[in-house]
Amino acid sequence: MVHPLHVAVAEELQHRLAGRGELIKDPACGGTQYLPLFVGDIKRRDTRMCDVDLLIVLGGRVMVIVEIEESGFLPTKICGKFLQSAIATHFIHDSRPESALPYGKCVLFVQVLDGSKCLKPGTQKDKQGRLIEEKIRSILPLKGSSITDYRMFFVQGVDDLAGLESVGAAVSYALA
């Protein structure tokens, strides 16, 4: 099932890549495959950590991981997806010619949240999100993990061009 914000983020990143690297999309982003991350280079059920929404591969290595949340803001979900991705070391999928794609030396993890759905008046979710981003960035890199940077963006739906551009700019900067 395709999700509007997922597609908008994928389109922004595809535009920013402009032929540099490969954007791999899950079905919610308009792709055709799930994007499983594993610990190690052998595909097994016990080493599968999670599926993510978008990956950017450059030079045969995963350089950017993107997770998009359209349904709400739960700190356990936000932190859990980040930690599972940080524990993982490879993207493995049968559709790839490589048996496994390792993470690069410096990987950016991006979380995009639909602010139009999770930033309701009277809540402190925006402050909580900034605190989570600040705290995660302060502990990076985690020992044994290639994720060296973390960014969180609240995008106010598919029409928030400035928000989408911020996501694209952060990814472009990380790949420069």
State the predicted function of each range.
Residues 22-60:
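Active-site metal-binding core of divalent-cation-utilizing nuclease and nuclease-like domains
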Residues 36-41, 67-74:
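Surface-exposed cleft-lining segments at the edges of enzyme active sites
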Residues 140-163:
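Charged, structured surface patches that assemble and position nucleic-acid processing machinery
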Residues 158-175:
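C-terminal helix of von Willebrand factor
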Residues 70-135:
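Catalytic cores of nucleic-acid endonucleases
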Residues 54-56, 64-70:
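Conserved catalytic cores of phosphodiester-cleaving nucleases, focusing on short active-site segments
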Residues 1-10, 14:
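Nuclease catalytic cores
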Residues 62-65, 108:
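Structural motif
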